[in-house]
């Protein structure tokens, strides 16, 4: 499933040593399957010990080049519990930066964190930003309006991405939380959607051992 894509952005990597080991093992498995893959893992986020985690990127080195060092956002780290992880990649002669993010849970009001994202395009005017991850907030929320007014657009609309513990009315997806946002003047969408990996398992319980969210995907070209 993963080897069909060139970048994999991962949230909720365990902050302890085991999390980094798991990402390394996944990268090793991809290398066995073909192509040459590498990975980068963030430092621990500056959140309380019960909420801290790491982010990770895995990328296909035959297609992409990582530019410089990846970094955790510092300016708003006291405002955002798990500050986003930035990494710049180059495809041929064009660059883009993926902003990997995991928001606080819905009951904690993730919009109080997401509202700071409107400052990132001005803070990094030379970067072609793609915001990606688990926002715990639907794209229809007004907190995304400032980004939309700047020309950013979500790759998914009305697409639920979290897995229920059991089917309800024949449906297993619960909430519209995961998405990506890109600037339409700099990026063209070729394809976007979800990867319904849970259909490969005998039950939702089995699938949720892997993840309680389904992966989302974005195929694009750079202007």
Regions found by a protein language model. Name each.
Residues 3-7, 33-38, 92-97, 124-129, ...:
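Loop/turn elements at helix/coil->beta-strand transitions in domains of secreted/extracellular proteins
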Residues 9, 19-26, 54, 110-117, ...:
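Stable alpha-helical elements in mature extracytoplasmic
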Residues 12-13, 103, 133-135:
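Active-site metal-binding loops of divalent metal-dependent hydrolases
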Residues 14-94:
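Structured beta-strand-rich core segments of catalytic domains in phosphoester-bond hydrolases
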Residues 16, 122-129, 137-223:
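Metal-dependent phosphoester-hydrolase catalytic domains
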Residues 55-57, 84-88, 100, 179-180, ...:
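Conserved hydrophobic/aromatic beta-strand scaffold that supports enzyme active sites
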Residues 72-75, 99-108:
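Surface-exposed cleft-lining segments at the edges of enzyme active sites
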Residues 111-132:
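His/acidic metal-ligating clusters that form di-metal
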